[in-house]
């Protein structure tokens, strides 16, 4: 049997860290994409082509990681809701409101 030792509020607070991490990663990727464009305007040749290829291969992986963090945030919030609902249901068994 699973045991969660955090309150729903604590779980929700921790979930925000994942959402913030996702936002930060997306901002970093945006900044790097902009920098990549500036480099592309000033660097030609085979070396840049390889550099660009690596960047293009990496970008979707970084975006996928940001999406995963957002999904974790949502899962934690859903877990917090379930814990809160379960606690409320159990308290009703004792006539508590």
Curated annotation (Swiss-Prot):
The keyword Kinase belongs to this UniProt entry's keyword annotation: no
Family: Belongs to the WXG100 family. sagEsxA-like subfamily.
Record note on disruption phenotype: Significant increased of early and late apoptotic host cells including infected epithelial cells or dendritic cells.
Subunit-structure text: Forms both homodimers and heterodimers with EsxC.
Protein name: Type VII secretion system extracellular protein A
Domain of life (superkingdom): Bacteria
UniProt-listed InterPro entries: ESAT-6-like_sf (IPR036689), T7SS_ESAT-6-like (IPR010310)
Keywords: Coiled coil, Secreted, Virulence
Described function: Virulence factor that is important for the establishment of infection in the host. EsxA is required for EsxB synthesis as well as secretion. Modulates host cell apoptotic pathways and mediates together with EsxB the release of S.aureus from the host cell. By acting on apoptosis, plays a role in the modulation of dendritic cell-mediated immunity.
Species of the source: Staphylococcus aureus (strain USA300)
Lineage: Bacteria, Bacillati, Bacillota, Bacilli, Bacillales
One of the record's GO cellular component terms: extracellular region
Residues forming coiled coils: 61-93
Subcellular location: Secreted
Key word Cytoplasm present: no
NCBIfam families given in the database record: WXG100_ESAT6
């Amino acid at each position: 049997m699973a045991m969660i030792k955090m309150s729903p509020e604590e779980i929700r607070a921790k979930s925000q860290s994942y959402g913030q991490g996702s936002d930060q990663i997306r901002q970093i990727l945006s900044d790097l994409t902009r920098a990549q464009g500036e480099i592309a305007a000033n660097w030609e040749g085979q070396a840049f082509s390889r550099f660009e290829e690596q960047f293009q291969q990496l970008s979707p992986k970084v975006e996928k990681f940001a999406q995963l963090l957002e999904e974790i945030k949502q899962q934690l919030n859903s877990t917090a809701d379930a814990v809160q609902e379960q606690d409320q249901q159990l308290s009703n068994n004792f006539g508590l409101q």
